Amino acid sequence: MNNLAAVILAAGKGTRMKSNIVKVMHPLGGLPMVSWPVNTAREAGASNIVLVTGHQSEKVQDFFEGQSDVRFAVQEEQLGTGHAVACALPALLGFSGMVLILCGDVPLISTATLKAMVKQHRSRHAVITVLTADFAQPNGYGRIVKDGDGFIKRIVEEKDATDAERRITEINSGIYCVESDFLTVAIPNLKNDNAQREYYLTDIIKEAANLGLLCQAFPVADPAEVMGINDRAQLAEAGQLLRGRINKALMLDGTTLIDPQTTYIDRGVRIGKDTTIHPNVHISGDTEIGNNCLIEPSVVIKGCKIGNGVTIKAGSVMMDAVIHDDVAIGPMAHLRPGTELKEHVKIGNFVETKKIVMGEGSKASHLTYLGDAAIGTNVNIGCGTITCNYDGVKKHRTVIGDDVFVGSDVQFVAPVTIGRNSLIAAGTTVTRDVPPDSLAIARAPQVNKEGWKLKKK
């Protein structure tokens, strides 16, 4: 639909959030709240998106920097929704077609609903289509007033409504589809003669109806889609609904979630078939997980690429790591950015890694720190091993060749290189390179003083 544009209203501060962060930038499902209607408009076919910002405009614009289909308009003073759209009109100069008007704090609207609304708008040759919902308790919403044929005559804000109008349960969602030619004529005619002294976008409905132009309602199938977010309680409720959508889609696509209500997966995460995820798992960022994986409870994964057949045991934390096929991790392992584990690697409990590549079949089973290291294939890292990578000024690298056996309680004082097929004896502090096929041992000889304990009594 290249004749479809969108205006997203996101200028409000959101005082009820009681936050130093502007409302539309609060995170929801791994993204700022405002990015949800922007993405939905894009998925519905809008190729020209105008984001109207106000409070903390720079922060909002910085997030969308580089998205070529998003332009910005600034509403310096918040004088109502009609004024906000007026601020957006210069960015739509030369555009002719349909304009979707969405709210930055109504993030649950679905692509399917917008597409259906646009389709009906086009097929009935409407000038304005209003997305409406029926609420048993419509307090706080504008009411839809219709004529005898069921078309919209006007929308009345609650503060300006009569008692009879307040009893109407069909409400205005704040989402519209409007013909651009009419919008550019009607917006400059708005007046602020109302209780709020604001320029109401809804007044264009009355003008269109007075001109005999078709203004229709499009009732939303699921009223939750038009839920507005004004405080943190509503933000949490919206997050729960979004998680439900995300998790249901994953399950229908072949992923097993043991308890979807306590599984937290962000939009855009990709998970393969026959992967099982246990409760209290958090997966976010640009994460991709392969087929036939097992993720045990209380695992945190952010921005990782994970292959097939990977097991991640309880309590492990991973960020910006690359995990190849058939790797076992945890429990209670910590994989920091720059970690790459090749096929059949084992990382056990209380092992921390950072900026390492670990070759196929290698293992570090317990209580180890591996940082700034290249580790070959089939290497055994003993319990208590540490790569001493920092000298107080800069980081240094440890290189361990293939088939090396590292005993327990070994320290590698980097920079150091260990040749292939070597053995590092338990308790050794390695300060120099070790040639291939060698034994390295650096510890004080054992001394037994017989009878020493008895003399102390």
Swiss-Prot record:
Span list, region Linker: 233-253
CDD domains xrefs: GT2_GlmU_N_bac, LbH_GlmU_C
One MF annotation (Gene Ontology) recorded for this entry: glucosamine-1-phosphate N-acetyltransferase activity
Cofactor(s) this protein requires: Mg(2+)
EC number from the UniProt entry: 2.7.7.23, 2.3.1.157
Class of the enzyme per the UniProt entry, highest EC level: transferase
Residues given in the record as UDP-N-acetyl-alpha-D-glucosamine binding sites: 9-12, 23, 75, 80-81, 142, 157, 172, 230, 336, 354, 369, 380
Key word DNA-binding present: no
InterPro entries: Bifunctional_GlmU, GlmU-like, GlmU_C_LbH, Hexapep, NTP_transferase_dom, Nucleotide-diphossugar_trans, Trimer_LpxA-like_sf
Localization, UniProt: Cytoplasm
Region (Pyrophosphorylase): 1-232
Keywords, sorted A to Z: Acyltransferase, Cell shape, Cell wall biogenesis/degradation, Cytoplasm, Magnesium, Metal-binding, Multifunctional enzyme, Nucleotidyltransferase, Peptidoglycan synthesis, Repeat, Transferase
Entry coiled-coil feature ranges: none
Active site: H366 (proton acceptor)
Co-factor: note: Binds 1 Mg(2+) ion per subunit.
GO annotation, cellular component aspect: cytoplasm; membrane
Residues bound to acetyl-CoA: N389, Y390, S408, A426, R443
Region of interest (N-acetyltransferase), residue spans: 254-457
Pathway: Nucleotide-sugar biosynthesis; UDP-N-acetyl-alpha-D-glucosamine biosynthesis; N-acetyl-alpha-D-glucosamine 1-phosphate from alpha-D-glucosamine 6-phosphate (route II): step 2/2; Nucleotide-sugar biosynthesis; UDP-N-acetyl-alpha-D-glucosamine biosynthesis; UDP-N-acetyl-alpha-D-glucosamine from N-acetyl-alpha-D-glucosamine 1-phosphate: step 1/1; Bacterial outer membrane biogenesis; LPS lipid A biosynthesis
Subunit structure: Homotrimer.
Assigned protein family: In the N-terminal section; belongs to the N-acetylglucosamine-1-phosphate uridyltransferase family.
Protein purpose: Catalyzes the last two sequential reactions in the de novo biosynthetic pathway for UDP-N-acetylglucosamine (UDP-GlcNAc). The C-terminal domain catalyzes the transfer of acetyl group from acetyl coenzyme A to glucosamine-1-phosphate (GlcN-1-P) to produce N-acetylglucosamine-1-phosphate (GlcNAc-1-P), which is converted into UDP-GlcNAc by the transfer of uridine 5-monophosphate (from uridine 5-triphosphate), a reaction catalyzed by the N-terminal domain.
Full protein name: Bifunctional protein GlmU
Native source species: Geotalea uraniireducens (strain Rf4)
Gene: glmU
